[in-house]
Amino acid sequence: MSEAAEMVRAFYAAVSRADVPTVIGLLHSDLHWTEAEGFPYYSGTWRHPQDVVDKLLVPLMRDWDDFSVVVDDFIIAGERVVSLGTYAGVNKATGKVMPEPFAHVWRVADGKLARFDMYTDTLLVHRAME
């Protein structure tokens, strides 16, 4: 597996452990992070690693039990990595399970994760939260 794909894999593992220092350490200081519009935690494009923690990871841990990112496949093209998989978790407020397929497009620059774009059916998340 490529170094870029290993970085993406390490990021997902750090998210699953709620390992904030590793998450921040993997992200480029000049970040371009975009969640899918309509995703509950979407608020435009984030430019700083701490934004990912504050606007995504903290709310995920607050709102979901057993949240995980299960990657089924990586498509690697140099410094670009596409990961295909499923989000899973149980919403704490509703008790509903969220199985949600996703595609993530990553770009590595200067040995760090520099860009993230999420593609997913955001309605599935909203249904689990209602």
Label every model-predicted segment:
Residues 22, 28-79:
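A solvent-exposed, acidic/Ser-Thr-rich amphipathic alpha-helical stretch
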Residues 3, 57-130:
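A beta-strand edge to alpha-helix "cap/lid" segment located at domain peripheries
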